[in-house]
Amino acid sequence: MDIQLDALLKFPHVTVESCAQQDNEVYLKLRFLNEEARCLRCEKLSSELHQNRPILIRDLSIFGQVTYLKIPRRQFYCHDCQGYFTESLTFMDAGRQYTRRYEEHLYQQVQLSSIEQVSRVERLSFDRIEGIFKHQYALKKKQDGQESSALALMKSANVKDTKTSPQ
């Protein structure tokens, strides 16, 4: 639809099909540009669309207005696995109602203030903000753990290389 909106959105293989504003809220209807998805089990591409159910998820605000994205949740059939799978999206975690960047934003805001304050500003319940915070904390802890173990492995490899290399 609008190249500028697509560029601002910064989601790969996605275009903004329509934009509507209602009661200090913005609604962007998205459409995927790719006709196929990668199977989560066998990693092969499938273009056999089984069903498409649009969902509404919250994203970062645009110009101080609450923003929602209406995205198609596509389910494909994989001939190799003989099963159905829901397309994974780079901009949101499976089963979540918010974009990753919005959840990361909320996590950062809670670190700077409190769950209560963020709850009031974002007009979300305390429990929602707390759940998002815990989810992001767990992701970051897991990521930090993986980075720490990878770093330790690299250091270990460097020590071995130093011991075995001729001097």
Please describe what each predicted stretch is.
Residues M1-G83, S88-L89:
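Short, conserved DNA-binding cores of transcription-related domains
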Residues A37, S113-S114:
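Residue-level signal for the short linker/turn that defines the boundary of a DNA-recognition helix
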Residues Y98-S113:
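Short, amphipathic alpha-helical "recognition" segments used to contact nucleic acids or chromatin
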Residues F133-Q167:
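RNase H-like nuclease fold core
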